[in-house]
C-alpha cells in the first residue's frame, strides 16, 4: 500500500513540535502541557538510544504531522537474547482518518521491527480497535493487565 500523494512517512524531527505533533497525539490520549524544552529533552533522549526508540510520523504535503507512531525495541534474555518490538502511540488526526494512514503507519512500523531483528511485535489496544489491528495483520495474543499510578 502506498501513501496518498503528498504524504510522507519519516522519523520524527525536533521541528515537529511546531508541526502539530502533540495535537495529533492528543487524538489518542491525554498529553498534558509539554513545553518545547520538555519536548527537546525527550527527543534528545530518544535520539541518544536509536536502537531502542523509533518514533515515526506521517506528514501531509504542507509538512504538518497527521499521524504518529512509536516502535520501542526491547532486548530480552529469552529467545537467545532476542528483541521484541512494541508499537505504541498510534494516532491519526481526526481530519485525516479514513485515508488508511493508520494502516500504513502500523504496517510500516512492523517492517521497521523486522529490520531490527525483532522476533515478534506486540501492541495494546482497546476492544473497539481490535478489528483495525487485525486488518494490519495482528491477532489476539492475550490480555493486557494494568496498574496505574
UniProtKB/Swiss-Prot annotation:
UniProt cross-references to Gene3D superfamilies, sorted A to Z: 3.40.630.30
Residues engaged in binding substrate: 29, 76-79, 88-90, 119-120, 124, 148
Coiled coil region boundaries: none
EC number(s) recorded for this UniProt protein: 2.3.1.4
Highest taxon above the source species: Eukaryota
Enzyme class: transferase
Metabolic or biological pathway, per its Swiss-Prot or TrEMBL entry: Nucleotide-sugar biosynthesis; UDP-N-acetyl-alpha-D-glucosamine biosynthesis; N-acetyl-alpha-D-glucosamine 1-phosphate from alpha-D-glucosamine 6-phosphate (route I): step 1/2
Catalysis: reaction(s): D-glucosamine 6-phosphate + acetyl-CoA = N-acetyl-D-glucosamine 6-phosphate + CoA + H(+)
Assigned keywords, A-Z: Acyltransferase, Transferase
Record GO terms (molecular function): glucosamine 6-phosphate N-acetyltransferase activity
N-acetyltransferase domain ranges (all copies): 7-149
Residues that coordinate or bind acetyl-CoA: 90-92, 98-103, 133-135
Pfam families noted in UniProt: Acetyltransf_1
Family: Belongs to the acetyltransferase family. GNA1 subfamily.
Name the UniProt record assigns to this protein: Glucosamine 6-phosphate N-acetyltransferase
Gene: GNA1
Amino acid at each position: 500500500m502506498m501513501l496518498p500523494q503528498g504524504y510522507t512517512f519519516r522519523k520524527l524531527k525536533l521541528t515537529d513540535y511546531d508541526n502539530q505533533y502533540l495535537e495529533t497525539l492528543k487524538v489518542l490520549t491525554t498529553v498534558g502541557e509539554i513545553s518545547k524544552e520538555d519536548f527537546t529533552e525527550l527527543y534528545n533522549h530518544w535520539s541518544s538510544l536509536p536502537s531502542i526508540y523509533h518514533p515515526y510520523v506521517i506528514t501531509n504535503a504542507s509538512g504538518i504531522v497527521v499521524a504518529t507512531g512509536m516502535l520501542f525495541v526491547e532486548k530480552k534474555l529469552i529467545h537467545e537474547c532476542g528483541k521484541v518490538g512494541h508499537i505504541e502511540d498510534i494516532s491519526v488526526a481526526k481530519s485525516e482518518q479514513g485515508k488508511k494512514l493508520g494502516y500504513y503507519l502500523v504496517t510500516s512500523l512492523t517492517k521497521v521491527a523486522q529490520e531490527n531483528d525483532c522476533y515478534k511485535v506486540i501492541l495494546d489496544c482497546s476492544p473497539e480497535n481490535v478489528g483495525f489491528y487485525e486488518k494490519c495483520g495482528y491477532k489476539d495474543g492475550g490480555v493486557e493487565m494494568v496498574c496505574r499510578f
